Curated annotation (Swiss-Prot):
It is an enzyme of class 4 (lyase). GO terms for molecular function: lyase activity. This is Putative hydro-lyase PA14_37210. Keywords: Lyase. Signal peptide: none annotated. Belongs to the D-glutamate cyclase family. It comes from the Bacteria.
Length: 265
């Protein structure tokens, strides 16, 4: 049986897509998948870090809009889907150990610990369908790429051992489209809301749009403005500085696709 095309994958209901991912039959990015459904960034921490991280999310709701938190040791997000298992239902994960480069894997069952607490954080991929419905084209989708993401000079509000830079995702749009995109995305605070910045990237500490820190480069046309949304990769940048002994995250752009619609929250 031939592998499904990306267009075919985009039509799959989230439970079917997750089954495909769980079996190891898809390991690519999730931008453009699960149309109209919430996608979530993932952070998994040992319980000794969980309270600090929960407070960090509360202090930084633009970058870390919290969708759900698991019970200690549980790999399930009951609010997001009855059969979700965070150990296997994302296409790609990063396992981070103190002092080592992160390792990317497609399943984290072998790394799971009894005191792990999982956090689901809203993702801007969720509102992309609303932009498309309004006739606003998205360059990264047209090119079949992941979105471009950058570390910025915008500091997060600290919580205990957790502090560091805000990460943003970038989408280039013409001026009229940019105005409409701001209006549309401001309605969805649980998926990062309106952009944090638009225009000159240097003003927020980004040196070169052609060299994103995460994801893929997305070209900017002469008549376009870059718009920057707060991004759920922010916790990875912050945790990289805090250096827990062990934590697990999604690989940037490889999200959990939930059963909840993006406009339900």
């Amino acid at each position: 049986m031939p592998e499904p095309t990306f267009h075919e994958l985009a039509q799959l209901p989230p439970p079917v897509l997750r089954q495909l991912i769980r079996r190891g039959d898809y390991a690519g990015h999730t931008s453009g998948l699960g149309q109209r459904h919430l996608q979530a960034n993932l952070v998994i921490l040992q319980k000794s870090w969980a309270d600090e991280f929960l407070r960090f999310c509360a202090l930084n709701p633009r970058a870390c809009p919290l969708l759900d938190v698991s019970e200690p040791g549980s790999p399930h997000f009951a609010r997001l889907g009855a059969d979700i298992d965070v150990r296997s239902d994302l296409p790609r994960y990063r396992v981070h150990r103190r002092g080592q480069e992160p390792v990317e894997v497609n399943d984290i069952g072998a790394f799971w610990e009894a005191d792990f607490v999982a956090f689901a954080i809203g993702c801007s991929f969720s509102f992309e369908q609303a932009l498309l419905d309004a006739g606003i084209g998205l360059r990264h989708l047209e090119l079949g790429r992941n979105v471009a993401m950058y570390r910025t000079a915008i500091a997060t509000r600290p919580s205990g051992r957790l502090a560091g830079p805000t990460v943003v995702s970038m989408r280039p749009l013409k001026a009229a489209e940019a105005i409409r995109a701001i209006q549309i995305t401001s309605r969805f605070p649980m998926t990062h809301g309106a952009p944090l910045h638009l225009g000159d990237p240097a003003l927020i500490g980004i040196r070169d749009l052609a060299r994103p820190d995460y994801g893929d480069p997305v070209p900017l046309a002469a008549d376009e403005i870059p718009l920057f949304w707060a991004c759920g990769v922010t916790p990875q940048a912050v945790l990289a500085e805090a250096q827990p002994e062990l934590y697990i995250s999604h690989a940037p752009g490889h999200m959990l696709v939930s059963d909840r619609l993006y406009d339900e929250l």
